[in-house]
Amino acid sequence: MDSVLARVSKTFHSTFETDPQLITLDTVPGDIPAWDSMGHVSLASGLEQEFNVNLDVDDLMAMENVREIVRVLNEKLERK
Amino acid sequence: MPQFSNPFELRGTVVVTGGTRGIGRAISSQFSRAGARVIANYLRDDKAALALKAVAEQEGLPIEILRADLTTPAGQQQIAASVIAANEPFCGLVHCAATGVHKSIDSLTGRHLDWTFALNVRAFFELVKLLLPQFDRHSSVLAISSMGATHALPHYTAVGASKGALEALVRHLAAELAPRGIRANVLTPGAVATDVWKAIPDAEARLAEAVRRSPIGRLVTVEEVALCAQFLCSAAASGINGQALMVDGGTTILA
């Protein structure tokens, strides 16, 4: 099974058409021009679908960068 | 009422949320040229913010960029702290920051509405409340809305609903805050070619259609929107309160 980071990278690709190789734990919004406030909710919607989890407003606030996205998703997956 | 040699000039400090890209950036630039000291808030795009800062420094424009998450109390407090630190009359809040999920009703969930309303409506409400003690006696609140507040657009249910709520909130604020010398209005741009369209399905086709339908035969520019924003926040508009000004080249008057 793909790692969480790999699946996050896949979601970045489907949302922003980014090269999956470019998404690392150190990736931040400034690295991806389309990752603005509008892009952030589109990404969140894609992550919900990919991981079959529910993300609330607090989760979106916490997901400031890829490292935090992976952390939030790991917590959600552990609780399932 | 302060006397102005030019009734369209601005003064004091103005906060522009979402003020480093697109319409917000144009407003930040125009307001600083009109005499305001601008605090241009952003959250994610450091490059765009730094680019605006560089232009401001080059042209000697009083624009401060401020990274803050408006949906959090900490981010709202950062904005308030910056206003206080400016040590000038606080004369305006322009809410350009916006987000939204563009999906049909079949794919839309309550959480999508929560995400959209958190920035588009709730953050604005919290900021107004937090900044109330700071507003100067002759100041303005301006919310940037969209046609989706009053018209049904494809995949726009969540954003349109939030903009409708935003407009209703501004009308009520206009009535409640007028006795304190604070006017509140809405500015509704029509289709404007900015990066926001990257997130909207069928953007190219919809922009082409917007051009075709526009009586002026083109899209409205960010500069035109910014000039209208300046007017609404200036002394020249001191009799305008609780209104929504549409800047769309006349598109919405067509049957």
How does the language model describe each region?
Chain A
Residues D2-K80:
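Phosphopantetheine-dependent thiolation modules in NRPS/PKS and related acyl-activating systems
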